[in-house]
């Protein structure tokens, strides 16, 4: 007599293998999705900093890029102090990615009319913003702001991590 189907053991083995492969695929997809969100947030914030500097140079006046609600993770606003409409642009973020800045750039970055970042009291400013990975992961995206106003997007493990709870 010829066999027409599969045995119970063959079916259970195939289902177990399918479940295992699905689990690996879902984990990889989740990690890839998180990495893409972090990369997009880093690029958007670096571009906003460059736009703020360019706007300050173009208008020859102070322009501020300020974190929404005091947290870069929720987005940022481009502001002009000497304009009828102080809000020039608003960038939204959904808070999916945690962004932390060191003390000088924790909540805002102000550019002079010459494109130089300034602290309160008009002292030169430099700092870095870190795009945080998920807890337990390394932070690999960092935006550095130099004293001259140059904005650079770096990829790699920072020397002094700013993100709480992450391993570096």
Residue ranges, per PLM feature:
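N-terminal single-pass transmembrane signal-anchor helix
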Residues: 1-29
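N-terminal helix-rich module
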Residues: 24-54, 58, 62, 66-168
């Amino acid at each position: 007599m010829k066999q027409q189907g599969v045995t119970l053991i063959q079916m259970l083995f195939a289902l177990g293998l399918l479940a295992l492969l699905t689990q690996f695929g879902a984990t990889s997809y989740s990690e890839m999705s998180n990495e893409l969100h972090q990369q997009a947030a880093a690029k958007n914030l670096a571009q906003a900093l460059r736009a703020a500097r360019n706007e300050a140079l173009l208008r020859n006046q102070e322009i501020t890029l300020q974190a929404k609600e005091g947290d870069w993770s929720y987005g940022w606003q481009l502001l002009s102090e000497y304009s009828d409409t102080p809000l020039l642009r608003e960038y939204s973020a959904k808070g999916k990615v945690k962004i932390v800045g060191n003390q000088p750039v924790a909540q805002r970055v102000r550019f002079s009319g010459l494109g130089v970042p300034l602290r309160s009291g008009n002292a030169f400013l430099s700092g870095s913003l870190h795009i945080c990975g998920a807890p337990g992961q390394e932070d690999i995206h960092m935006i550095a702001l130099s004293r001259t106003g140059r904005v650079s997007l770096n990829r790699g493990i920072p020397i002094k991590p700013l993100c709480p709870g992450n391993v570096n």
